[in-house]
UniProtKB/Swiss-Prot annotation:
Cofactor annotation remark: Binds 1 Fe(2+) ion per subunit.
Protein name (Swiss-Prot/TrEMBL): PKHD-type hydroxylase Bphy_5374
Keywords from the named record: Dioxygenase, Iron, Metal-binding, Oxidoreductase, Vitamin C
Listed SUPFAM superfamilies: Clavaminate synthase-like (SSF51197)
InterPro entries registered for this protein in UniProt: Oxoglu/Fe-dep_dioxygenase_dom, PKHD_C, PKHD_hydroxylase, Pro_4_hyd_alph, Pro_4_hyd_alph_FE2OG_OXY
Lineage: Bacteria, Pseudomonadati, Pseudomonadota, Betaproteobacteria, Burkholderiales
GO biological process: DNA damage response; intracellular iron ion homeostasis
Origin species: Paraburkholderia phymatum (strain DSM 17167 / CIP 108236 / LMG 21445 / STM815)
GO molecular function, one term: iron ion binding
Enzyme class: oxidoreductase
Amino acid sequence: MIVSIPDVLSPAEAAAMRAQLEASDAWVDGRATAGYQGAPVKRNQQIGEGSPIALEMGDRIVASLERHPLFISAALPNKVYPPLFNRYEGGMHFGSHVDGAIRLVPGSGARVRTDVSVTLFLTPPDEYDGGELLIEDTFGVQEVKLPAGHAIVYPGTSLHQVRPVTRGARVASFFWVQSLVRDDTQRAMLFDLDGAIQRLNASNGDEAARRTLVGCYHNLLRMWSDT
């Protein structure tokens, strides 16, 4: 399931965050944090994990997502890996790969299972060429290039890549979510069911039908969730 999450940050918030990141001296070679599979195909820059600016900006992003009902519905978050930040420019790219299954949070000993991958775009799409995120799913390859402040949520099991940036610079945040429901098919069913309930609420639909659907939703969540 691939879901676009609009307006995680306003355009002004995204621009201010990008400016602070661009001015930072904490950028390092992105291969420093890549795994065995990713390192040979990863060519980008990244804000060092655990740096003060990464922690500050990451906290802002997580706080905004916690208030975003579409993100909650799609990801059903249990744990969120502290957001990271990357930059692509001058032909930089990231070849096709699958994210590692488990991420160790630096300095904490905590582990996060990467059920859901998230990319939050911070650069307006007209300011750079290339840089599309390509995600392979059951319906083929999905090409993603969103407005600044919008995010894309997709299964951590997906093959994905970032095309070379040939003009300008693409700055984004990326991170992972350990979901209450680890299986993507089950999450997709719950997402569709929640959407149907919300539409019934908005249209003042049949109350008995709404109660039945709400009951089904929570019983399925109870059956499938890990806390």
